[in-house]
Regions:
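PRPP-associated nucleotide enzymes
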Residues: 1-319
Length: 319
């Protein structure tokens, strides 16, 4: 496996240690010994208990809830490794928070995604490995190389096995216009039809009207998005597909299960039969909703890490 004489070291913060353990098991190395904790006043503290001098270091930490704590853990881990003379540091961020704040929606708004993208570089990271950024152009916010893995192939494999030949009679539905490109690629891979839920207000102070563009009548549908946060949009879209479009059944999938606030209650009470999520965010976030099924991205991240370590192209992981 070693092609350049450097040791590979993998460490994790507290955001998603289960995923880090699974990745290490697949690669065949032990998770690095480190302690990531907080002082009484809330400051993050990192202690590395093994040498990283000259090593190729991978630091795994999603910037998920508690978002700011997870982010600071990652940044301080990067700094600790660079100050300990690590040869190269890759920040592995399966879920990159703040990505939705990627533009100025109104006057005097910050572009927080750009600010946060600067932080790993300022801390000393040499590369970022992430998955399904909310907008792919966020890769350009970083001043270091970024590998943005796609969850699409994982879902394609899952639904191809789940539904088999039935896929050709199903429809992929984008819950909004902004997700159409992502949903179209997914639909093409599975030879499914494509539909869009269009939300609009006809006049001021009127309720939002949900229109379904495309034929979903009598069809089994899959709602496809990059994340589920409070689940309001995806549950409303599912309701429109059934009540307005006349769909037979609705499944949903998303790369990142943020699942904030009323999300679990909304999913439990929705018409959605199953919600497939990737484990970029801890599976414990989905406890309380039996509809949720987690699919592991550890194999994809493990292969990406090995390829980066060996200086091999990761292009095959996008197919």
């Amino acid at each position: 496996m070693i092609s350049h004489g450097k040791d590979m070291k993998i460490f994790t913060g507290n955001a998603n240690p289960a995923l880090a353990q699974e990745i290490c098991k697949l690669i065949g190395i032990k998770l690095g010994e480190a302690e990531v904790k907080s002082f009484a006043d809330g400051e993050a503290s990192v202690s590395l208990y093994e040498t990283v001098r000259g090593s190729d270091v991978f630091l795994i930490n999603s910037t998920c809830k508690p978002v700011n704590d997870s982010l600071m853990e990652l940044l301080i881990m990067i700094d600790a490794c660079k100050r300990a003379s690590a040869g190269r540091v890759t920040a592995v961020i399966p879920y990159f928070g703040y990505a939705r704040q990627d533009r100025k929606a109104k006057s005097r708004d910050p572009i927080s995604a750009k600010l946060v993208a600067n932080m790993p570089t300022a801390s000393g990271a040499d590369r970022v490995l992430t998955m399904d950024l909310h907008a792919s152009q966020i890769q350009g916010f970083f001043d270091i190389p970024v590998d943005n893995l796609l969850g699409n192939p994982v879902f394609v494999d899952y639904y191809a096995k789940k539904f088999g030949e039935k896929c050709e009679d199903m429809v992929v539905v984008s819950p909004d216009v902004g997700s159409v490109a992502r949903a179209r690629t997914f639909a093409q891979k599975l030879h499914m039809g494509l539909a869009i839920v269009d939300k609009r207000r006809q006049k001021a102070n009127q309720c939002e009207v949900m229109n379904v563009i495309g034929d979903v009548e009598g069809k089994d549908c899959i709602l496809f998005d990059d994340m589920i946060d409070t689940a309001g949009s995806i549950c409303n879209a599912a309701k429109a597909i059934v009540e307005v479009g006349g769909a037979n059944s609705v499944y949903a999938c998303a790369s990142h299960g943020v699942l904030s606030g009323p999300a679990l209650e909304r999913l439990n009470n929705s018409v959605i039969k199953e919600v497939a999520l990737l484990n970029t965010i801890p599976e414990s976030m989905g406890e309380g909703c039996d509809k949720i099924k987690y699919i592991s991205v550890a194999p994809m991240f493990a292969e990406a890490i090995e390829r980066i370590y060996q200086e091999i192209s990761i292009a095959k992981l996008f197919n």
